[in-house]
Amino acid sequence: MNHSDTLSLSLELLEQPSVTPIDHTCQTIMADRLAKVGFHIEPMRFGDVDNLWARRGTEGPVFCFAGHTDVVPTGRLDAWNSDPFAPEIRDGKLYGRGSADMKTALAAMVVASERFVAKHPNHKGSIAFLITSDEEGPAVNGTVKVIETLEKRNEKITWCLVGEPSSTHKLGDIVKNGRRGSLNAVLKVQGKQGHVAYPHLARNPIHEASPALAELCQTVWDNGNEYFPATSFQISNIHAGTGATNVIPGALEVTFNFRYSTEVTAEQLKQRVHEILDKHGLQYEIVWNLSGLPFLTPVGELVNAAQTAILNVTGTETELSTSGGTSDGRFIAPTGAQVLELGVLNATIHQINEHVDVHDLDPLTDIYEQILENLLA
């Protein structure tokens, strides 16, 4: 079987067991290809994380492909139908950890850039790659650090295409033009431990906190807008008690998360939570962690370029969406860049037997190349 350029490079990347935060030479494989077509290669290592900044051209505007080489752990190997790091094609599907999220998109980006540069050696502006091995992990030494470095030297990205698997039913049907913000909290409610037979000598933090938690669950934080659904509050963990059946616990710990829209700020959410907890007279402490601000790329040059390319290649009228979890786009958007996420189908990401349709790889490459044509030719 003759493999296309994109499929061949995908197979090479998928053979690398790059479980986060280990890159396992994926970035070197990409950098070697890019260097041959005139990209300046700049590895950036922070802590135990490999990052790659590659750029062809010195002028603006700057079109940047962004993505990650790290993958999530495989889970039980005996549950896979084949070795997750020995990619296999079966029934038109390419199986392997990272096939959907997101090594095939990385391959498509490289091949699209090679083809575009061959046709337009003196293209407008610059093409860049921002690749990290710390997207699936804590995301502390990855894209955010590269962006900080670029900002310090006033190197700006105009348009950024993140290759996350955005498609739902067919290639290109969904493009993510924004993401909700994510705000986490750990709430500790203090009570007084005691014997269940003598409740008057104790204070049960579960009983005291329950009305407040119920109110938090029932609160309408906002109504969303045309791009974002309403803000969602979800409790993920509750822990209290010693395990004994005759002891009133002395403390309660609750972990919760907000996925929030551009209609509200993290500070407003924090303030409203404190007001509810205070109203119920709780003795508490709370630790907040903001893991991502919401961002939105309105219809403009990048959205138009992507929608046109998808329509030309696949015949699909794409839909803009802000659904799903956070991505590294949250670190790039605050610089003022227009950010879009466009990649293969996301139905099997992070799952056992993760796979992608082989027949989507060349059209994805064509879409990426056409976006470059639309913006930099």
From Swiss-Prot:
EC class of the enzyme, as a word: hydrolase
Catalytic activity: N-succinyl-(2S,6S)-2,6-diaminopimelate + H2O = (2S,6S)-2,6-diaminopimelate + succinate
Active site annotation, chain numbering: 70, 135
Gene3D superfamilies for this protein: Zn peptidases
GO biological process, any: diaminopimelate biosynthetic process
Keyword Metal-binding in annotation: yes
Pfam families the record matches: M20_dimer, Peptidase_M20
Residues annotated for Zn(2+) 2 binding in this entry: 101, 136, 350
EC number in record: 3.5.1.18
Names of required cofactors: Zn(2+); Co(2+)
The protein's annotated pathway: Amino-acid biosynthesis; L-lysine biosynthesis via DAP pathway; LL-2,6-diaminopimelate from (S)-tetrahydrodipicolinate (succinylase route): step 3/3
Binding site for Zn(2+) 1: 68, 101, 164
Molecular function terms, GO-annotated: acetylornithine deacetylase activity; cobalt ion binding; succinyl-diaminopimelate desuccinylase activity; zinc ion binding
Cofactor binding note: Binds 2 Zn(2+) or Co(2+) ions per subunit.
Keyword tags: Amino-acid biosynthesis, Cobalt, Diaminopimelate biosynthesis, Hydrolase, Lysine biosynthesis, Metal-binding, Zinc
Summary of subunit composition and partner proteins: Homodimer.
Function: Catalyzes the hydrolysis of N-succinyl-L,L-diaminopimelic acid (SDAP), forming succinate and LL-2,6-diaminopimelate (DAP), an intermediate involved in the bacterial biosynthesis of lysine and meso-diaminopimelic acid, an essential component of bacterial cell walls.
Similarity comment: Belongs to the peptidase M20A family. DapE subfamily.
Protein name: Succinyl-diaminopimelate desuccinylase
Organism this protein belongs to: Acinetobacter baumannii (strain AYE)
Gene that specifies this protein: dapE
